[in-house]
Amino acid sequence: MGDDGSINRDPDALAGPVLFYNEVVIDHFMNPRNVGELDEGNTDGFGLVGDPSCGDQMKLWITVRAGRIAEIAFKSFGCPGAIATSSMLTALAESKTIEEARSITDDDVIEALGGIPEKKRHCSLLGVRALLAAIEDWERRRDGKEGRP
């Protein structure tokens, strides 16, 4: 993320590793889906996760209507793989029931992207972990438990 919270979609970020990413991954990096923030006052769940080994971080917001993810948005600070997998995760989770969204795995995200390099596999963990954290936050709020973890 840039200083203003925007995602760095500089094509030069792909200059070296572009040969390692397929067209779907590059598209989700250059044109991430559901990027940005949802209004905190109107969200039902929030997840914040990071990977200390590489410095990647992801924030994810959801709104839930009738047991389905009605809106989902993310902000990610990380490599092209982290941004692309976060984007794909939100595309997969949008409109799903909570249980369907909860069942999305790292492998589902990687498969939907057509694969990512093995050394970037850890990037796919952020989106799934952030989604699970947002769902847990929604459940706490729904059940009337105070505060976030």
Regions found by a protein language model. Give the residues of each.
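C-terminal binding/interaction regions
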Residues: 2-39, 46, 65, 96-149
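Short Gly/Pro-enriched turn/cap motifs at secondary-structure boundaries
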Residues: 48-53
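Short, thiol/selenol-centered motifs that function as redox-active sites or metal-ligating centers
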Residues: 54, 76-84, 123
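Short beta-strand elements
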Residues: 56-67
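Active-site cofactor/substrate anionic-group-binding motifs, chiefly glycine-
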Residues: 61, 73-77, 92
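Immediate flanking context of iron-sulfur cluster ligation sites
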Residues: 68-77, 111-114
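Alpha-helical support elements that line or immediately flank enzyme active sites
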Residues: 81-96
